[in-house]
From Swiss-Prot:
InterPro entries: Na/H_antiporter_dom_sf, NhaA
Record-stated family: Belongs to the NhaA Na(+)/H(+) (TC 2.A.33) antiporter family.
Membrane-topology descriptor: Multi-pass membrane protein
Residues passing through the membrane, by range: 18-38, 68-88, 105-125, 133-153, 163-183, 186-206, 211-231, 232-252, 267-287, 305-325, 338-358, 372-392
Keywords linked to the UniProt accession: Antiport, Cell inner membrane, Cell membrane, Ion transport, Membrane, Sodium, Sodium transport, Transmembrane, Transmembrane helix, Transport
Physiological role: Na(+)/H(+) antiporter that extrudes sodium in exchange for external protons.
Catalytic activity annotation: Na(+)(in) + 2 H(+)(out) = Na(+)(out) + 2 H(+)(in)
One GO BP: regulation of pH
GO cellular-component term (any): plasma membrane
Single annotated GO MF: sodium:proton antiporter activity
Entry protein name: Na(+)/H(+) antiporter NhaA
A Pfam family per the record: Na_H_antiport_1
Subcellular localization, as worded in the UniProt entry: Cell inner membrane
Amino acid sequence: MNAPLHPLKQPSMLRQLLATEAAGGVLLMFTAALAIIIANSPWASAYQHLLHLPVGPVLTDKLGPMTVHMWINDGLMAIFFLLVGLEIKRELVDGRLASWEQRRLPALPALMGMAVPALIYLAVSRGELGLAGGWAIPAATDIAFAVGALALLGKHAPLSLKVMLVSVAIIDDMGAVAIIAVFYTSSINLLALAGAAGIVAVLLAFNRLRVVALWPYLIGVAALWYVTLLSGVHATIAGVVGALLIPYSAGSGAEREASPLLKLEHGLAPWVGFLIVPAFGFANAGVSFGDLGWSDIFAPLPLAIALGLLLGKQLGVFAGVLLAVKSGLASKPRGASWLQIYGVAMLCGIGFTMSLFIGELAFPGQPEKIDAAKIGILLGSLLSAVIACVILRFAPKQAD
């Protein structure tokens, strides 16, 4: 995930961030590939047994025993979303999205890059019973994978494009969080939700009292995660909400460096990048291709997702940039050709982590649909990555 920085003033720190993202992205690629290999090997049953092994206490009667898979998706991914929330708050306060001028270029591509894939998904899956709930699966971009692929290209993409990609992905994350909270929430436990509101009030009070010690906020976020789990709202949302309530001092100097938010972000980033996200990839990417035929690949669900990622993302993001620049709303990224911008738009079609996560939420208790969704996600993401890398490798370096 993103390290604290001010990208316009400290480009060298952005390069350091991209190097970290690239390493995490490569590790994610490795664990996802490993999961696919194991799922198609004699160890497939052992892999499934491990994921569904009950571990630890029963947290809620509704969920029952917590399996390894559930701890990763509901527990560790809450920490992932906590880091996402920390990044969003920092970027909005004094980062890439601190001013309206900085928000103009990535905002429209990010929004169109979510809307167009969803519309393509709905158009392709139209009339198919039980598939409408998966409309958000191709709407997300995997920042670790995308930045990792971009970093592997070295100097074939200017820094301005890397800033644009990360900025679009941050707004994309904000949209994904909102989608999960609004559209993938089950029946609500009002008592637990009231408890969550009470914890939020306590965290707000800590802010007003200028509490700078980190541990009260960590306890509060952990409690918020548990009551959110009980409430019926997906528990990962607690990570984002908790992050937004952790204090952050804008500007520069010792006060900023001492901010609880910055301390926590620095502490979480390596764990999320090198443990949590790769673990999620390993736990969720494994799908068997043993009996896979062309009819399975071109079935409505995987086809809708693959086309949403491959076509929808590139069309939405590129059209958003083109519209923002031609209308005078924003300036074209410095030193980038339109072909390079198109390549980055194509790169946004890598929707791995968040798409897999939303797929699990869209089809709960439907393993066949989840596996079909995984096929579409893998196919769309892989094609997007390969085509984008070819475009960016051979695109002219000078601006058009």
